[in-house]
């Protein structure tokens, strides 16, 4: 049988990065080679040469793998500006592929502060609003920092603790500590900023079991926060939140309990179980383990570790399942919906076996196109991050221009920023490597600067704050 005829030769990743001159890019340039039947060609030789910028490549030539992909790393030259590398396919007449990167003289992301967190497991999510950072410090509880609010004279480069609180044992979960996430509620009618909702993430088993309650903390006096109410579901534990503040409804991902909607209008005290509006398990009783939830475009979107991405109706419309798309090859993690697109991360605490028998880590970002009805349609190409095992947090900047990913479980852990000018073709902008990776990250704008508040955990837990103003311009 004659060898396949090499026909397709295209770039599939790495172009359009932005990095400091003289450094090696974090994402390799990658080409794809296919035959006349559009099937990948293995064993093809691809030659790489620097075309502009006086940089270097990690190899003069590489060979395509079973998927038809060949890659090389580019070390930038010393000058700022555009730097390019050309890829040529063996003796083929295929047009060479050119990759371009912008070299800059200073880092597009710079660390401005690091706040040590007690190693009582450490730090999980951080919620930032109005110059206050609400740090979920697991068994230590909630720690509130002034990072620009003014009550303690703190700033992003010099956070100052305002107060802390360790909630009591959960009335349903029976657990103490394990404070995982927070949301500071701004009342749309009264203007009150009275309540912070806290989520408790207890032990669990993917697909079948979890524990953890929701706590309500009154922060009318920021210096002396008080626990005033709680909510729990027997046999299930909460994970991430989203608030429809206009409707005064808290939506909570509840792992094997699915998604719940809670009425949080008025004064909150005691047991809030009577305020449950609706509950739905998107994948059914035996296939639901919901990680995250978000209200967007008049729907509720839920990312489920076992089944994928779901569209639900709002609580006011009964919160039923409207549509969904399954992700069977990896465990799904966080989500973010922006305009007509959605993005979901993947978790790699344990590998997941796909239909071919391959065990896959959680190193993929899944992109979704939302139909006019809001129903998600999975796009064929995922973003694969080499050197990480989990894409743990996903967020889009307030202006919709940048996508933030945090990653861990591998040598390339940290955070990554991508340009969303064309959501179908993400363009790498910047990354920051952090030993041990970053578990969570969120955007904030304080004093005219764009920031990322990230959690390094466990090992040497810390709240790490980066100025990414240059990367968001």
Q: At which residue positions do the language-model features occur?
A:
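The feature marks long extracellular or luminal low-complexity segments
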Residues: 1-106
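Feature marking well-ordered beta-strand scaffolds used for ligand recognition
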Residues: 104-473
């Amino acid at each position: 049988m004659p060898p396949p005829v090499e026909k397709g030769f295209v770039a599939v990743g790495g172009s359009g990065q932005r990095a400091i001159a003289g450094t090696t890019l974090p994402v390799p340039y990658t080409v794809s080679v296919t035959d006349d039947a559009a099937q990948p060609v293995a064993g093809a030789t691809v030659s790489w040469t620097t075309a502009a910028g006086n940089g270097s490549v990690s190899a003069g030539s590489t060979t395509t793998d079973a998927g038809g992909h060949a890659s090389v790393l580019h070390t930038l030259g010393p000058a700022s500006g555009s730097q390019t590398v050309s890829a040529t396919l063996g003796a083929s007449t295929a047009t060479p592929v050119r990759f371009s990167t912008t070299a800059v003289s200073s880092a597009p992301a710079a660390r401005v502060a690091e706040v040590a967190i007690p190693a009582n497991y450490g730090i999980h999510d951080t919620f930032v609003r109005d110059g206050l950072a609400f740090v979920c410090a697991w068994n230590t509880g909630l720690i509130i920092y002034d990072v620009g609010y003014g009550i303690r004279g703190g700033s992003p480069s010099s956070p100052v603790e305002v107060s802390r609180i360790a909630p009591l044992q959960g009335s349903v979960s029976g657990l103490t500590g394990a404070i995982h996430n927070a949301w500071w509620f701004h009342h749309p009618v009264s203007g009150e900023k009275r309540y912070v909702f806290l989520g408790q993430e207890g032990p669990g088993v993917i697909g079948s079991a979890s524990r953890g309650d929701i706590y309500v903390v009154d922060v009318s006096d920021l210096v002396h926060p008080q626990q005033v109410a709680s909510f729990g579901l027997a046999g299930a534990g909460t994970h991430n939140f989203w608030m429809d503040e206009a409707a005064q409804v808290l939506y909570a991902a509840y792992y094997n309990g699915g998604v719940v909607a809670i009425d949080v209008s008025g004064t909150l005290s005691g047991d809030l179980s009577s305020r449950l509006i609706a509950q739905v398990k998107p994948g059914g009783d035996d296939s639901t383990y919901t990680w995250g939830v978000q209200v967007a475009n008049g729907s509720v979107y839920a990312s489920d570790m076992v089944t994928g991405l779901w569209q639900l109706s709002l609580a006011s419309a009964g919160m039923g399942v409207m549509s969904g798309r399954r992700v069977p090859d990896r465990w799904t993690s966080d989500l973010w919906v922006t305009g007509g697109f959605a993005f979901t991360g993947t978790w790699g605490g344990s590998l997941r076996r796909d239909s071919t028998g391959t065990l896959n880590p959680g190193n993929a970002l899944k992109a979704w196109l939302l139909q006019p009805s809001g129903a998600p349609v999975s796009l064929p190409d995922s973003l694969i991050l080499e050197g990480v095992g989990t894409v743990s947090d996903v967020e889009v900047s307030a202006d919709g221009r940048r996508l933030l990913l945090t990653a861990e479980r591998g040598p390339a852990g940290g955070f990554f920023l991508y340009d969303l000018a064309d959501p179908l073709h993400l363009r790498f902008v910047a990354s920051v490597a952090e030993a041990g990776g970053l578990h969570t990250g969120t955007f904030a704008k304080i004093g005219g600067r764009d920031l990322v508040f990230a959690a390094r955990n466990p090992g040497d837990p810390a709240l790490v704050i980066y100025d990414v103003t240059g990367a968001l311009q």
